[in-house]
């Protein structure tokens, strides 16, 4: 029987395949280990309808890279506005009350509507700068288009330095989203798996590489 690997080094934290449930502090989410599309994965489902965080216990992150394979799709019975919201929260503080987040809207990636396609990626900073405030005050600055397929495994990477973050998807050489003014400033906090409302989410092969 294949085991779930857990590796923790001084400079790199990495989980091959599923992330052990013992390493997650799931909040408002149900967590299980499953096989999804041939890959051993951590499945997070939205228990209360509002999404939630699953911080990695003991993680501390300021600058560096976070890489993961993820797949998100609307859960069965989700409201029409569900998009399969899925991503990573970082510099999580206050037990999850404050954090930076970059996430995907997988169903937007191939929508027959350019406005939706251009909202395929999203930066938000809770609680002061949710996505809707950023869209209203700075339309187009904190979201972008990238090709996505709901429910399909997607390679996701964010690189963070100071108040700047870049999102890379599908191992692309260039970022599909650049944020130059992270709202929490040059902060330090935990890393968390992030799941939005009405989402069935899968995560595997998480790697956190701090930057000196």
Per-region residue spans from a language model:
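Positively charged n-region of N-terminal signal peptides that target proteins for export
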Residues: 1-4
